[in-house]
C-alpha cells in the first residue's frame, strides 16, 4: 500500500534511477517490469533497487504470508521513494488509517469479507439516558463499494457486535427505551410524535448522531467519509416519489430496503436509489439485542419514514421483521458509516 512516493535528484549506476523502498526489515523486495526483475539490496534501513529501464515498475515486498505492492513510474534518472505497509487479512489487526488506504483503492474485498469485525471503544454521553465509559464493542463490514454508482465507494460498517467472531448483534439502548420522550436527548427520532421532515430534519440525524460520533475514537472518526444517501426527506403521511432526495451523511441509520431488500412501510421510491447491503443479502440475522442485556431483543430504528403515516418511522422488530414505531419512542440505535 502506497503512503508516499516521489522522485528527487541523484541516482545510481547505469540508467541512474533508483527506487528506495521503506518496509519492515526482513522483507524480500523486488521490482518487475515485463520480463525484467530486479532484487533490492538492504542498506541503512531501506531497500534499494537499481532499475535498468524507464517505465512502470511493480515493486513487491513479501514477509511470511504478507505482501504489499506499489507501481512506480520511472520517467527519468533520480531517486524514487515509496513506503509500503503490510495489510493483515485479519481486519482487527489493521489500524483505521490502513483500512482507509485499502478502501480508497477499492481493494477491501481482496483482504477481508463481509461480516469481518473491528473493535472500537466508545467513551462519553450519547443520550440523556446513556453515558458509556470505555465500552468495548465491534463494528463489522456490511458492504464493499456498496451502491457505488449512487453513494460513492468505500467500505461500509454497521454496529454493533459483542465479540470478534460469533458475537451477538446489539443495539445501543438508553434508559428511556420503549417509552415516549418529548424533551431532552434520547434515542428517539423526534421529540414530537411526527415524521414531518423525514430523515433530513429528524432530531436523530441533527442532534443524536453527532453526539454519538463525538464518543467514537478519534482514529475512527478521522477516516469516516461523507456519503450520499437517499431517503424520504419530507414525511407527513404520503407515499410520494419526489419526497425521496439525497443527503450527505457521515453516521447514518440504514433504510428499510437496505436491510430487507423489500419495501413494506417505507416510501416506495426509496428502493429506486438504494440496494440491500451485502451483509443482509447473505442471510445474516436482523435481530438485535440490548447492548447491556444481550438476552433481550429490541426494536431498532431505520431512517425510513412510514410513508403513509404522519407519526411513524420504520424499524426492525424484536423478531427481525419489518415494523414501525412512533417517532418519539426511544428505541435501539445501530449506526452505519463508510470509510
Where are these predicted regions, by residue range?
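A short, solvent-exposed beta-strand micro-motif common in secreted/extracellular proteins
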Residues: 53-64
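Collagenous Gly-X-Y triple-helix signature in extracellular proteins
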Residues: 83-339
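Structured interaction patches on ligand/partner-binding surfaces of diverse proteins
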Residues: 64-86
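Short, low-complexity N-terminal tether/leader segments at secretion or assembly junctions of large
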Residues: 1-16, 66
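Short beta-strand/loop motifs in extracellular/secreted proteins, especially
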Residues: 25-29, 55-57
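Short, acidic Ser/Thr/Gly-rich low-complexity loop/linker segments typical of extracellular
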Residues: 33-51
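A glycine-anchored, Pro-Gly-centered beta-turn/N-cap motif
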Residues: 45, 53-55, 78
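A short, amphipathic beta-strand motif
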Residues: 16-25
Amino acid at each position: 500500500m502506497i503512503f508516499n512516493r516521489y522522485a528527487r535528484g541523484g541516482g545510481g549506476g547505469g540508467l541512474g534511477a533508483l527506487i528506495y523502498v521503506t518496509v519492515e526489515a526482513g522483507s524480500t523486495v523486488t521490482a518487475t517490469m515485463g520480463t525484467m526483475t530486479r532484487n533490492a539490496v538492504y542498506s541503512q534501513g531501506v531497500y534499494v533497487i537499481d532499475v535498468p529501464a524507464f517505465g512502470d515498475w511493480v515493486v513487491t515486498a513479501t514477509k511470511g504470508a504478507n505482501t504489499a505492492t506499489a507501481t512506480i513510474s520511472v520517467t527519468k534518472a533520480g531517486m524514487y521513494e515509496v513506503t509500503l505497509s503490510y495489510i493483515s487479512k485479519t481486519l482487527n489487526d489493521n489500524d483505521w488509517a490502513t483500512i482507509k488506504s485499502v478502501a480508497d483503492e477499492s481493494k477491501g474485498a481482496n483482504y477481508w469479507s463481509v461480516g469481518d469485525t473491528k473493535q472500537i471503544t466508545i467513551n462519553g454521553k450519547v443520550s440523556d439516558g446513556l453515558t458509556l465509559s470505555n465500552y468495548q464493542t465491534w463494528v463489522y463490514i456490511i458492504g464493499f463499494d456498496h451502491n457505488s454508482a449512487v453513494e460513492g465507494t468505500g467500505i461500509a460498517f454497521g454496529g454493533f457486535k459483542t465479540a470478534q467472531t460469533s458475537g451477538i448483534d446489539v443495539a445501543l439502548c438508553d434508559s428511556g427505551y420503549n417509552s415516549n420522550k418529548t424533551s431532552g436527548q434520547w434515542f428517539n427520532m423526534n421529540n414530537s410524535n411526527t415524521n414531518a421532515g423525514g430523515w433530513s430534519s429528524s432530531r436523530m440525524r441533527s442532534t443524536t448522531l453527532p453526539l454519538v460520533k463525538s464518543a467514537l475514537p478519534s482514529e475512527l472518526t478521522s477516516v469516516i467519509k461523507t456519503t450520499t444517501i437517499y431517503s424520504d426527506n419530507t414525511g407527513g403521511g404520503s407515499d410520494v416519489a419526489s419526497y425521496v432526495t439525497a443527503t450527505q451523511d457521515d453516521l447514518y441509520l440504514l433504510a428499510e430496503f437496505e436491510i430487507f431488500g423489500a419495501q413494506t412501510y417505507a416510501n416506495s421510491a426509496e428502493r429506486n436509489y438504494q440496494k440491500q447491503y451485502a451483509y443482509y443479502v447473505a442471510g445474516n440475522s436482523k435481530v438485535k439485542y440490548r447492548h447491556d442485556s444481550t438476552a433481550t431483543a429490541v426494536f431498532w430504528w431505520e431512517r425510513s419514514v412510514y410513508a403513509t403515516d404522519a407519526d411513524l418511522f420504520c424499524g426492525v422488530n424484536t423478531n427481525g421483521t419489518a415494523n414501525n414505531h412512533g417517532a418519539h419512542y426511544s428505541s435501539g440505535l445501530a449506526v452505519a458509516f463508510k470509510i
